């Protein structure tokens, strides 16, 4: 980055993607300021690292700043953004700053509608095992780091690429991963065709010597591959892929053989449950093999993987009740979480506390949400987490509850907020239940509160 850049201001600094970049910048010696709407453990961590952070977005927060970095959730009417533009201070999206960091390393960008965070974390773990010491920027807390970012001394930067606002097209990696392509983020994209076009552009953006590692089993990926003019390696469960898995065991622990380019590399043991995590592991193997990491290091790294925060995360037990927390907020992610829960806890009642995320997503996928949520044993449904979106008439959790009741007979109860859900837990849970707090908003807070009350 240009030596004239001294002080960086980050609007929405507490977000999962922004905070990781902030941590890397702090470790590189930059002066980092920022703001967010509320205190959090992430804010506290960044302050300890030296960041100066204000709570609330106010124009007077800006001082002598070289550049302003904005989260994708921050709109143009934000007073800090407006003042920066009035004073001619550059305002750039998060992905553009990530691109600047990527210029310092060889970039690996991991994209897809689902599975980005876990796949990025698995890839980082394999690179660590091989002694590559990568710089890593993730959208969740990698348990091995205790953080969502780390500045390494090696030549690679492994980053989660956010497709939600199209800004992932700014990145300049030499290796891309696409885990899947599904309908989402219709607050930005006007159609599924636009989403497909964005991913095609993303894959074609790698240099001529670069590589795309993509899930060959995914229908969305299959549709766009004929339009990709760069090199591609596919992975999946089908033997037609370049890299594929032969499942031995799929449950609390995943065991599978990996066949790459016709050669069996060996047996992988992965402690992350769920069939979807086998696919995530295959993506990590594909990237690792591409940069010359041995199959032995791949197998060892995956076996030592300690997981990611909020991805089917075990929180604890109380009175015979198991508490799991998961970030899933798209119907396909919810389905994967519930499928995993049924395999891990086959004879137990599954109670889900779900907080939908964004009005636009709930509207676009209303029917899909009704279908997948109707498969649980007991559903506690709270109001939609807006993520700075404005309400859409008729799109609310009460109507979602009614939609579920119209197609199933499951026990579903609506609660106006997460406090009401928390206070209801002692009355609806009993010994032997599995409580899953599910969603990308604030629902994550009620599990620990329940365990300690």
Swiss-Prot record:
Cited function: Cell wall formation.
Provenance organism: Lawsonia intracellularis (strain PHE/MN1-00)
Family: Belongs to the MurCDEF family.
GO biological process: cell division; cell wall organization; peptidoglycan biosynthetic process; regulation of cell shape
Alphabetical list of NCBIfam families matching this protein: murC
Primary location: cytoplasm
Compartments it resides in: Cytoplasm
Protein name: UDP-N-acetylmuramate--L-alanine ligase
Pathway participation: Cell wall biogenesis; peptidoglycan biosynthesis
A cellular component term, taken from the record's GO annotations: cytoplasm
Any Pfam family hit: Mur_ligase_C
Binding site for ATP: 112-118
Annotated EC: 6.3.2.8
UniProt keyword annotations, A-Z: ATP-binding, Cell cycle, Cell division, Cell shape, Cell wall biogenesis/degradation, Cytoplasm, Ligase, Nucleotide-binding, Peptidoglycan synthesis
Swiss-Prot/TrEMBL catalytic activity: UDP-N-acetyl-alpha-D-muramate + L-alanine + ATP = UDP-N-acetyl-alpha-D-muramoyl-L-alanine + ADP + phosphate + H(+)
GO molecular function, one term: ATP binding
């Amino acid at each position: 980055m240009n030596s004239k850049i001294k002080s960086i201001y980050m609007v929405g600094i507490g977000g999962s993607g922004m905070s990781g970049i902030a941590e890397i910048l702090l470790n590189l010696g930059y002066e980092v300021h920022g703001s967010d709407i509320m205190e959090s453990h992430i804010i506290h961590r960044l302050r300890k690292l030296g960041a100066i952070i204000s709570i609330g977005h106010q124009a007077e927060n800006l001082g002598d700043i070289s550049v302003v970095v904005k989260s994708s959730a921050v709109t143009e009417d934000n007073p800090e953004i407006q003042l920066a533009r009035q004073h001619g201070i550059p305002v750039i999206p998060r992905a553009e700053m990530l691109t600047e960091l990527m210029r310092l390393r060889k970039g690996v960008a991991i994209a897809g509608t689902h599975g980005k965070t876990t796949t990025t974390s698995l890839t980082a773990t394999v690179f660590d095992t091989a002694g590559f010491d990568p710089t890593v920027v993730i959208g969740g807390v990698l348990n091995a780091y205790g953080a969502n970012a780390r500045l390494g001394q090696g030549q690679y930067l492994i980053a989660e690429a956010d497709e939600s606002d199209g800004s992932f097209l700014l990145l300049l990696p030499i290796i891309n991963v696409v885990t899947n392509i599904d309908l989402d983020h219709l607050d930005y994209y006007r159609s599924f065709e636009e989403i497909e076009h964005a991913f095609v552009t993303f894959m074609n953006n790698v240099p001529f010597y670069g590589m795309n590692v993509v899930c060959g089993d995914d229908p969305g990926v299959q549709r766009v591959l004929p339009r990709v003019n760069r090199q591609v390696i596919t992975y999946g469960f089908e033997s037609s892929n370049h890299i594929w898995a032969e499942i031995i065991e799929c449950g609390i622990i995943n065991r599978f053989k990996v066949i790459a380019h016709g050669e069996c590399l060996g047996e992988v043991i992965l402690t992350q449950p769920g069939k979807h995590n086998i696919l995530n592991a295959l993506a990590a193997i594909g990237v690792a093999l591409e940069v010359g990491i041995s199959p032995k290091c791949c197998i060892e790294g995956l076996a030592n993987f300690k997981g990611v925060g909020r991805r089917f995360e075990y929180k604890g037990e109380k009175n015979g009740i198991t508490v799991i927390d998961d970030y899933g907020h798209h119907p396909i992610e919810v389905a994967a979480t519930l499928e995993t829960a049924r395999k891990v806890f086959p004879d137990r009642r599954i109670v889900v506390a779900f907080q939908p995320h964004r009005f636009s997503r709930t509207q676009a996928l209303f029917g899909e949400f009704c279908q997948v949520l109707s498969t649980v044993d007991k559903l506690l449904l709270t109001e939609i987490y807006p993520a700075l979106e404005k309400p859409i008439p008729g799109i609310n959790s009460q109507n979602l509850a009614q939609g579920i009741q119209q197609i199933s007979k499951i026990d579903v109860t609506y609660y106006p907020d997460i406090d009401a859900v928390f206070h209801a837990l002692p009355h609806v849970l009993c010994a032997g239940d599995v409580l899953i707090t599910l969603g990308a908003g604030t629902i994550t807070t009620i599990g620990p509160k329940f365990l300690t009350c």
